[in-house]
Structure formats: C-alpha cells, structure tokens
C-alpha cells in the first residue's frame, strides 16, 4: 500500500473521544474535501474522498455527532480519475449541517477558511483539524531529498488557517500556490514524523521512519563507495606516474645511480600498486615507509639534476597526460 493510502487508512480508525475534536475533524474534512451545492432550492453538502474507509468514517461521524443521515456514492475510476472515489452527500439536512460545521456562517454565507470554532480552538482541535484535512486531501511522499507531507487546499484562506493550526501544534508548515492550486507543505523529515505521530498515524510513522533511515544508510553507502572509487582512481594515477618517473630516472642515470637508490626504484617498478609501507616491508633489509619514500625521492632528484646538466628531458617529462586519465 502506498504511503498516503496507508496513512489515510490508519487515520480512519483513530478513536477520538472528545466531542470538540470530533467536530474539528469533521469541519476540516468537509471543508477540504467538500462543497456546497444548491439543488432544487436546498443546500446539499458533499465530500469527495479517495478512500472508502474515510468516507465511512465521515458518514458515521455525521450521524453520531449531528444526527443527520447521509448517502455514499461510488465513482468508478476512469478518465483522469485514478481509482474509485466516494461521495458522501447530505441532502435533507444539508443546510443545518453546513451551519453547524462552519461551512456557512450565521448569515448563511460560505466560510472560505476554517470556521472560528476550529481556528480559535485548543491544540487538540488543531491536531484533529490536521487529521481531517489529511484524510480529505493529503499526500505523503516517500522519504528522500524531496520528501513532503502536503495538503491540497480549496483556497488561500483555508491554507493560511491550516498553517496557523500547525503552528499551534509546534510544526513549521508553509503555504504556497502551485499552478493556481493552494497547498500547505511540511518538508522537514523530523516535522513530518512529529505531525504524523500527533494526528494518530503511529504505524505509518514507524514505516516512514524505517524507509527514511534505510534511504539515508543507502545514500551514505553510495557516498562512501564514490569516495573509495575516487581514492582508488587517484592511487592508480599516482602509481602510473611514479612508475613512469622511476623508469625515466633509471634510464638517465644508467649505472651511475647508488645501489640503494636503484634498488628502491626497481622495487617500485616491481610492485606498482603497493603502498609505501608495503614497499618498505618488501625491501631487504626491511625499511620504514619514510625511508623507502626518501630513497625514491632522492633517485628522482638525482636523475632530474643529471637531465638538467645534460639538457635532456627529466623524469617529469615521462608523465604524459593520458597517464592521468584512469
């Protein structure tokens, strides 16, 4: 099950004992998923949802909290609609429900944001409003570079109200308009986990955190692998360049090089991928890595001096550009 569907399914089973919180959740759910229609002179309340469990929860809450009957209609997938959608519709008592849930104000005018009893309510109601908004039009992307918890809002007023509710919970959320659609977004991974926990998606937050940790471990492993590859490439280039310089040094000096320097140079050529420490251990008698490095350095310096005196290419000339590409 996708992350968003899993969260909505879990939230549809959250037990909310406080009446004020149940009203706040329903107000947000109807505001973010619903609409008001005039049918034959009557106000009809509708909410379109993409999860059957959420639709059943809304229908049950409308009956238990307000005592109004409602209908559920199923819209089969097709066209631009992915998957079935569920319409919860209140016809007979639509206007009463709209007034009681804050979709209409006392003068019968549509409320654009969230109703006052939610906006100015306690923190518990702010949490419930977020739960309702997410069940209505929320989405949760996989943990990663662009992970986000997002609510699609019916307008800028409801987006600002939801940002304010998040602030009361202690969560940083931002509203933005994308292609003419208002959205509220939580981007920080820790904030997403905290908000999921607050609204009651405990199993989902564990799954989300597990995927988040797994992705971070994988990213760290990839960075280390890239780092190791880069080090190997640098080491390979250095080994090729060192071998070319030593070969040129032995050509320049021929039999005039001191034996201990020549031996160090030949050891380098015989074991091109060995580290200085390994090279020193292979010497007879064994040498420290500083000692073997010093001998090779003196061999190259001696050869370069001879080359300058003779006016011929030195050891650096033996390192061609193609040797540095590995």
From Swiss-Prot:
Keyword Cell cycle listed: yes
Top-rank taxon, per record: Bacteria
Paired cysteines (S-S): none
InterPro entries according to UniProt: Homing_endonucl, Sporu_reg_WhiA_N_dom, Sporulation_regulator_WhiA, Sporulation_regulator_WhiA_C, WhiA_LAGLIDADG_dom
DNA-binding region residue numbers: 275-308
BP-aspect Gene Ontology terms: cell division; regulation of sporulation
Keywords, alphabetical: Cell cycle, Cell division, DNA-binding
Record bears the keyword Cell division: yes
GO terms assigned for molecular function: DNA binding
Similarity section: Belongs to the WhiA family.
Protein function: Involved in cell division and chromosome segregation.
PANTHER family: CELL DIVISION PROTEIN WHIA-RELATED (PTHR37307:SF1)
UniProt-recorded name of the protein: Probable cell division protein WhiA
The organism's taxonomic lineage, starting at the top: Bacteria, Bacillati, Actinomycetota, Actinomycetes, Micromonosporales
Gene designation: whiA
